[in-house]
Amino acid sequence: MFHVEEESSGGDGSEIDEEFGGDDSTTSLSRWVFDEKDDYEVNEDYDDDGYDEHNHPEMDSDEEDDNVEQRLIRTSPAVDSFDVDALEIPGTQKNEIEDTGIGKKLILALQTLGVVFGDIGTSPLYTFTVMFRRSPINDKEDIIGALSLVIYTLILIPLVKYVHFVLWANDDGEGGTFALYSLICRHANVSLIPNQLPSDARISGFGLKVPSPELERSLIIKERLEASMALKKLLLILVLAGTAMVIADAVVTPAMSVMSAIGGLKVGVGVIEQDQVVVISVSFLVILFSVQKYGTSKLGLVLGPALLLWFFCLAGIGIYNLVKYDSSVFKAFNPAYIYFFFKRNSVNAWYALGGCVLCATGSEAMFADLSYFSVHSIQLTFILLVLPCLLLGYLGQAAYLSENFSAAGDAFFSSVPSSLFWPVFLISNVAALIASRAMTTATFTCIKQSIALGCFPRLKIIHTSKKFIGQIYIPVLNWSLLVVCLIVVCSTSNIFAIGNAYGIAELGIMMTTTILVTLIMLLIWQTNIIVVSMFAIVSLIVELVFFSSVCSSVADGSWIILVFATIMFLIMFVWNYGSKLKYETEVQKKLPMDLLRELGSNLGTIRAPGIGLLYNELAKGVPAIFGHFLTTLPAIHSMVIFVCIKYVPVPSVPQTERFLFRRVCPRSYHLFRCVARYGYKDVRKESHQAFEQILIESLEKFIRKEAQERALESDGDHNDTDSEDDTTLSRVLIAPNGSVYSLGVPLLAEHMNSSNKRPMERRKASIDFGAGPSSALDVEQSLEKELSFIHKAKESGVVYLLGHGDIRATKDSWFLKKLVINYLYAFLRKNSRRGITNLSVPHTHLMQVGMTYMV
C-alpha cells in the first residue's frame, strides 16, 4: 500500500490573516463600526472557490458606480479567524532553548568545539604537505611566502567573511545554503513552486526586517526577482549547485582528514606503505559513519574535550618549534611576502593555492552547523581559541621546515617532538574523526531543509536529541556517503588528489554563500552599497583565484567528486521540477465549486457517519482526487476535512499558529479545508491519535469563532435596518486584513466569483436582509447543532483518505521531458519516504485511491 506524501504545497488565494502580538485585552475591546466609502475594490487574490450561502442579485456596472457603500471595520487589531489556535495565546511562542547558566554555557562551548571546529582544526595536518607538493621549497623565503598566504587566507575567509558577515545571515538560528534561500524566499516571492499563501506572512517567523519603502534599491531588487522567471530559476540552480557541493564535501572531508592522520604512521613506523594506510583508513571510516547515529548531544561532550586537547597540542607544538628552530617566521604577517612568493615561483605559486585553500576548509561548517549553537558562541570560540591555536600551529611548522626542507612531504608529524609523537598521533586521529563528523552533521541539516522546501526526495530523519530539535541523523544519506567515501579513498589512494577534490567542493560552497549573502545584504539588511561591493568583490576575487588553481588539477582524480556532485544536483533538480509540474497540474485539475453545488449536500452519493481526513497538496480549492473518491467509493463520510501539510520558509511555526481552517460550501455540506503549517526545522512526532485530537479541537474553535462573527453580523443588521430603506444600498464587510464580505454572509464564508467577471475586476455584493440569522439565539442553536454533529462523527471514527497522485508525460512531449518525468522523477517518488508514515496510521484507518495526471 502507498501513503500520501506531505508535499509542501499551497495556493495563491486569499486567506483571512492574523496580526499577532496583541493581548487579550485589546482583542476583547475590539468593536465594529460603519465607515462610509463611495468606492471599494476587492483584493484580486480573493478566493475563487468559496461559496455564498445566500443568493445575491447581480448589479449592473452602472448601478454599482452610483451606489454608496458602507464598510464595517474593526477599530483595533484582531486575530485571524482561521488561525484558531492563536486565539488561545495570541502572539506567544515558547523558545526551544532556554537561557542557560555558566555551567551549561561551558558545556555548550565544549560541544561547539566538537561539532563545529573539527574540520578547520585538522587542516594543519595536510595544508603545507599539499602546498609544497605543488610548489617545492627552494629556499627559506618560499616557506615565509607560503606561510603568509595561509595566514591571510585564514584572516580573509574564516575570520572576516564567515565570522563577521556570513554568520549573521542566519535564518532565525539556522545556517546553511537552504537557510539563506529560505530567508530570501520570505522577503521576495522567488520560489518556483507557487504554494505561497498571504496568511504565511502573518507567521511570527516572518517578522524579520523587510525592505524599507524608503530604500528604492531594495524594492527594485525585490520587484525584479519576483518578475523574472529566469532570475528565479538561476537562483534555484545556484542553491542546488551549492547544496550538491555540501554533500560532496561530506564525502571528501572524512577521506582527507582520516587519511592524513593515519599517514602519520609512515613517519612514526617507517615501514608502513601507502596501501596499508588506505586499508587502515577504510576501517576508521566505517567506524566513523557507524557511530554517527548516536548524535551530537551524546558525542559532543566526549569529542569536545578531545578537540580542546588537540588545539592545545597545536599551540604547544607550535610554540616549541618557534623557540627551538626559527622565530623569524613571524615576519610572514607582512603581506609583501605573498608578492615575493609569486614573483619567485610564478606558475608553481599559483598551483600552491590549491593547497593553501585547505587551511580554510571547515569555514562553511561553522555556518552550516549554526543550528546547533549560537552565533556568539561560535564567534568567541573561533576568535579566542581556534584562530590563535591554528596560527601558532602553522608558525611552528614553518619554523621547523625552515631548517628541514626535506620534511615537507609530511610537515605536521615531522615537526612533532619524538617524545610526544605517539600521544599526538592518537589525539590527531581522534581529531580527524571529529572533523569528519563536522561536515556530515552539516549535510544532514542542509538536506532536512531542502526536503522541507521541496528540493530533495523525502528521507527518513531521526532526531537524536530530545532537547535540541536541530540534531538529526539521516540513515540512508549516512550510508550513501560512506560508500562514496570508500570509493574515493580506494580509487585515489593519496591525499593530494583528495585534497584537490576537497578544494573544489569547499570553494563551490563558498562562492554560492558569497552570492546569496550579497543578495541578502542588498535585499534584507539594506547595507551600504560600498560595504556590499567590498564584501562581494573581495570574496569572489579570492575564491575565484583559488578555484582556478584547483580546477587545473581535475584530471588527477578529483573528477570523481565532480561526478558525484553532478548526480546530487540532478536528483534535486529533477525532484523540484517534477514536484512543480505535479503541483501546477493539481491546481489546474481542481474541482469547480459549481460541480459540488450541483451535486447537493449529499455530494451525489451516500454520506456515511464518520470523519474523513483527505490528505492533499492544495491549500486552496478542492483537489481532483476528491472527485475520484466520489466516483470510486460507494459512500463518503458525513464530514470531510481536506488536510494540507504545508511547509513554509521559516525555521519553525509556533503551535499557536499551526492551523488554518476554512469552510468549503454551505454548512450542510460539512466540508472543511485545513492547512497545517510547519517550518523546515519543525519535528512532526505526534501520533495519528494526537493529530486527530488537535485538529478536531481546532475545528471546534474555528466554528465557535465563526458563530461569534455571524452573531455580530446579525446584531449589526438589526441595528441598522431602520436607517436603510432602499435595498439597492450595498454594505460590504471589511475584515481586519482587508478582505471583503457581504453582511448577509457569515464572516468566514467564501465569496464566489461571478463567471462573467475577471479576477482583477471589482467585486461587490448586495445583501438580502431577510436571509441572515434572525437573532443570536438562532446562531447559538446552529452552533450547538453543528458541534453535536462533529462529536457524533468523531465517535463513528476517523478515516484517512489518501490519494496517490502521479504524473506522466504526454505522448507528444519532447524526449527529455519524458525521460525526466516518466523515469527519473517516477523512480525518485517510488523510493522516497511517504509523509503519512510520520503519523503511524494503522492500515485499518486507511482508504487509498490512485490517480495519474498527464503533463
From Swiss-Prot:
| Glycan attachment sites | N404
Q: Which residues carry this modification: Phosphoserine?
A: S766
Topology check: give the Extracellular ranges.
127-142, 255-268, 320-346, 401-415, 489-503, 550-553
Q: Where is this region: Disordered?
A: 1-67
Task: Report the principal subcellular site.
Answer: membrane
* GO annotations of cellular component type: plant-type vacuole; plasma membrane
Note whether Transmembrane occurs among the keywords.
yes
Membrane topology reported for the UniProt record: Multi-pass membrane protein
Entry-linked InterPro entries: K+_transporter (IPR003855), K_trans_C (IPR053952), K_trans_N (IPR053951)
Localization in the cell: Cell membrane
Q: Where is the composition biased (Acidic residues)?
A: 36-51
Where is the chain membrane-spanning? 106-126, 143-163, 234-254, 269-289, 299-319, 347-367, 380-400, 416-436, 468-488, 504-524, 529-549, 554-574
Cytoplasmic-facing ranges: 1-105, 164-233, 290-298, 368-379, 437-467, 525-528, 575-855
The entry lists its GO molecular-function terms as: potassium ion transmembrane transporter activity
Keyword field: Cell membrane, Glycoprotein, Ion transport, Membrane, Phosphoprotein, Potassium, Potassium transport, Transmembrane, Transmembrane helix, Transport
Q: Which PANTHER family match?
A: OSMOTIC STRESS POTASSIUM TRANSPORTER (PTHR30540), POTASSIUM TRANSPORTER 13 (PTHR30540:SF100)
Family statement: Belongs to the HAK/KUP transporter (TC 2.A.72.3) family.
Protein role: Probable potassium transporter.
What is this protein's record name? Potassium transporter 13
The gene is POT13
